[in-house]
């Protein structure tokens, strides 16, 4: 092994050696690949790690097949963020996906209808958010392939069914199933590179069900010190009949704020501004981060940027707007939602 690896890589390697299950080994190998310094001296090690990871995933897939499930097509990340829907069978994950996206998941009254991961794109205004439906989780039926997707996502929606008297037990079971596989569902991730900690939001679904209000109160009391809870209903008129309980149509806006997505628009120097699809980063992102999304060379070649923010940006974004005076900023300038950037190389 090369001697110039980081302490974080060495810790990940130690964790891999201590791993007992295939799930753990996959997670630890993914950590090692992420943390491995990239230079000529590590090329062979990088290739070896990738081979070992592929072999472990084949073993995991074979195991999943023996237990009646399979991963389906590989899910590529798209949009401003990727959020995975998890929960017990019948909780309403697929209904949420169907209502918010163009995806057409199979929905039925029998248990364990969903067999593969299925993506769909929800939208909050002009910000696309990828939702990924997943097979139900239960003791003895945690899909192996789900853990890698959850770890690599920007967040998890733990969907709970307010029509069930077993609601509180369902929540604790889900938390325990992930914890047993070294995935902690948390309100906030303390360390950016901690792949075992995944941000989670509890979606209390079926607020239109009889007795849902009382169960929602109990659920909130149970999870208050651990996770935030958002009420939801997929009933077509839920938002009109029970505005305090929330409609599924409100969920993309909730996710946009919860994920702290920032939209940035760009303007070509010397040309009239035309509003196009924004570039998206997360809160704390900088002008340099946006440059890298525009073109891989822009971040290094940028001399300065002109930035319209607040009322100046709003005026520029308005139809036939002229905009106010821009600021001149460097690549280190943090960006805010709604900023307009003009990049000068």
Where do the language-model regions lie?
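Conserved G1/Walker A P-loop phosphate-binding module
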Residues: 2-165
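Alpha-helical scaffold elements adjacent to nucleotide-binding pockets in ATP/GTP-utilizing enzyme cores
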Residues: 48, 99, 152, 170-177, ...
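Short, well-structured alpha-helical interface segments that form or flank functional binding sites
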Residues: 148, 169, 286
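Conserved Switch II/interswitch segment of TRAFAC-class P-loop GTPases
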Residues: 136-139, 151-195, 207-213, 237
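C-terminal-of-GTPase-core extension/linker across diverse P-loop GTPases
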Residues: 13, 17-86, 91, 183-345
